[in-house]
Amino acid sequence: KDIEQATGILSGSIYYHFKKKEEIRNILFQETAAKIVEEVSRYADCSNPYQAFMLNNFFTWYKIFHNIKYRRFFLESPIGNASLDYYIDNFYGFKKILSPEVAEKIHFSRMDLALCYGVDSGLGSYIIENYDEYTKTHDYIYTSERELTLYATILKINPEIYRSELN
């Protein structure tokens, strides 16, 4: 009935094509994910693979966190909210060891930190996949400062640049 109300299509017609709600959900998720990847890919055209990864991940999570349905799914569940609280506590503890030049640029709202949390969730896998090459020239503090500077720069951009397609 929920699907019928949301789409205006009779449930008999829907279930003629889809036997279970899960099939509909899977198709919708795949289509939504494909749209997000398509929109985000234009921001990730960078010569630096790390920055390209971070931008791609950033804008993907931005889209997720600014869509109320996705935000509820990821952050308003007890586990997601507890994970975010833990991340924020660690973030402010970590901020104390950053260089003063970087630390003074970092002023994030809870939503901004939620976005950073999502981006960071993919950072570990990126570094692991590129560990040998990455560790030749980077260390954890360098990586974190660079990442936080990137976040601060993007979050100060005129919101229309990355919010125009969200409405």
Name every feature range the model reports, one short phrase each.
Residues 96-100, 129-167:
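C-terminal peripheral helix-coil segments that are non-catalytic and often amphipathic
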Residues 6, 23-45, 55, 59-62:
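Alpha-helical structural segments
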Residues 46-75, 141-152:
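Amphipathic alpha-helical segments that line or abut small-molecule/effector binding pockets
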Residues 65-113, 125-132:
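Short secondary-structure transition hinges
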Residues 51-55, 59, 82-85, 89, ...:
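Short, well-structured alpha-helical interface segments that form or flank functional binding sites
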Residues 37, 41, 120-128, 132:
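Regular secondary-structure segments
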Residues 107-127, 138-141, 148-151:
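A conserved mid-domain beta-alpha-beta active-site/ligand-binding segment of alpha/beta enzyme cores
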Residues 1-23, 27:
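Helix-turn-helix
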